[in-house]
Amino acid sequence: MIKLDYPYASELNPLLYQMSKDDIEFSNATKLHVDAMDSPEVRTIKVPGDATLTALNIHQKGIKEVDKFFNWLKESIGVEIKRSWVIMYNKGQSANRHRHTEYKTTFSYGINIPEGSSPLMISGDEVKAVVGQVVAFSGELYHSVSSSEVDGRCVLVGHG
């Protein structure tokens, strides 16, 4: 597991958080299925556990602050991201245990982590979510987030 602090979090985080809140407010979430991520008309997806994916494949959107982050990530850990999204957890929402075996590396980056937010569980180990911090790990590892006790836990996720 690798942990890194992103030096430009103050530029990126407010943008991603507002974008995600707007996506959730102004669209109807689709249930998770194979083609949903690549359908241009789909803006949000509900995952098992009821958390909401937004900003689907944001690494391909040509947003300056986002591109800066993904370039930094590639230089820092040598991963070319193939899929990305932002996931928002409100009270009572979670992400069930899963893994991404089709990718060598998975990462989670803290955008908004209110006091009392659930940690990321990676293969049974508790990893506290921290604003501005990337946690990268093998896509082979099972991970989950237990039911949130607060609104607004928001992270950027990607795989490569």
Show where each model-derived region lies.
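Non-heme Fe(II)/2-oxoglutarate
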Residues: 1-77
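Catalytic core of non-heme Fe(II) oxygenases with the double-stranded beta-helix
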Residues: 78-147, 151-159
